[in-house]
Amino acid sequence: MGAAVFIGMGGSACAQTRPSRNLTVFKTPTCACCDAWIAHMRQAGFTTTITVLPSLQSVRSSRGMPDALASCHTGLIDGYLVEGHVPAPDVIRLLAERPAAVGVAVPGMPLGSPGMETPQGRKEPYDTLLVLRSGATRVFARHNPPA
């Protein structure tokens, strides 16, 4: 009987340390690129719940995301905000490393980021920023560096 309790507790501990793949996405009704980003996240193995709101400002501000980093959609996963067109590998890394942070952000809508692809394949350089609880940021990942 003791072994069964030990195994049950071990399984529970493993389940608690496994990062979630359940992403809640807040978006406005007119955002088309948001749907492309959601498809990118689903292809990477995330399940999504979509909430359509007239404004995302209260979602961001209530969780500590600075307005200066705002984009067209906001994700919430395991207590972290994912602001804008953040690539799935960056979210996976965030969940694995679990930094003391509000989340990650790709401010604006850089061409070539997930959901902002162009038919011509144009890609702008951009950074994924780690947003610290103080509101400060640091570069978390760099994408599409200039040739």
How would you describe each model-predicted region?
Residues 35-78:
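N-terminal, post-signal-peptide region of Sec/Tat-exported proteins
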Residues 62-147:
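Thiol/selenol-based redox catalytic cores and closely related redox-interacting motifs
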Residues 17-19, 76:
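Short glycine-enriched loop/turn motifs at secondary-structure junctions
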Residues 26-28, 53-54, 85, 107-109:
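Active-site-proximal beta-strand/loop segments in catalytic clefts of secreted hydrolases
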Residues 10, 27-30, 68:
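Secretory pathway export signals and precursors
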Residues 20-38:
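Local sequence-structure signature of Cys/Sec-based thiol-disulfide redox active-site neighborhoods
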Residues 30, 37, 52-55, 87-91:
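Stable alpha-helical elements in mature extracytoplasmic
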Residues 1-16:
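N-terminal export signals
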